[in-house]
Each structure stands twice: as structure tokens, then as C-alpha cells.
Amino acid sequence: DDCYTPPAVYDAVKKWVIDRFTLQDFKILRPFKPGGDYLTETYTADTVVIDNPPFSIYRQIIRNYLRLNVKFFLFAPALTLFVPDTMCQYVIINSVIKYENGAKVRTSFATNLISPESGINIIISKDLSDKIKKVQKQPQKVAKTQLPRGWFNSAQLLKFAGIGNYELEG
């Protein structure tokens, strides 16, 4: 459940969703935070949830959002995407997302943003697949921690383990 979405991937998905479903005037909510409770969020007619929920309670979240009439577009595990006995719709992509914790998960999306009058229940999107693949190929900037002079982290000290024996004081 600790699969946090890389910002570049989230931004690509959010832009695609806003453009595809004409959501420019909607407030985007991200209620799934560590230690948070998504049910305590304030959902209004002009809000839409675009987020990556905990996959362990994914089906429960879908059922709650449908019951509460919350607009949503949720990241979901592709292998267990479908939620039976719901009016949920799906966007299927051919992409594996590498999440912040290093997990690589074949991902698709569950939504209720597709107009029921359209009769469409599933969208298969090469466009969204390509956008996600493109941003994942871009080198990600890694924040470098500047340590004070004379301080070391364990990764720096590992280099010495292969070349000799050392004992450090302090």
C-alpha cells in the first residue's frame, strides 16, 4: 500500500484526465495520505478525486465513492481491476508504473467519469500509456544531501569496504 506515485507520472495522468473529461473547472483532490481517512474529506459537485489509493482497500473505496456520488479517477492494479456489481468504468493502459518505493506494478484506472449515456464502460488508451512511458524514461532528479565536512553516510563508506580494513572514530 506504500506505492506513492512519482510526481511526473501523476502529472501526466492528471493532465490526460482533465483534458479527456473536460475537468478544467474542477478542484482536484488527493485524499489518500499516510494516516489519513479519505471518508473525512469534503467532496462537492465541483471536485474530482484523481489519486492512487491503497490497493488493499481499492474495491471498498470504489463502492464508497459510488455510494457517495464522488467523481473519481483512481490508479488500480491492472490484474484485479474490475469491481463486480458496480457501475464503475475502466481505462486500461499497457504500462508498468515504477512507484516511489521501487515497486513495478502493471496499472490501469477505475473511474465514474465516463458518461453513462455513452454506453462506454471501458476505454483502452494508447495515448495515456505512451504519456506514462515517456515521463518514466526521463531521468528523475534525485535530491542530493549536502553533509557537513567530515560527515559520511553509509553509502559513501560502503566504497571502502571493498578495498581495505578501517576503523573510524567519532
Q: What positions do the PLM features span?
A:
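Class I S-adenosyl-L-methionine-dependent methyltransferase catalytic core
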Residues: 1-48, 54-170
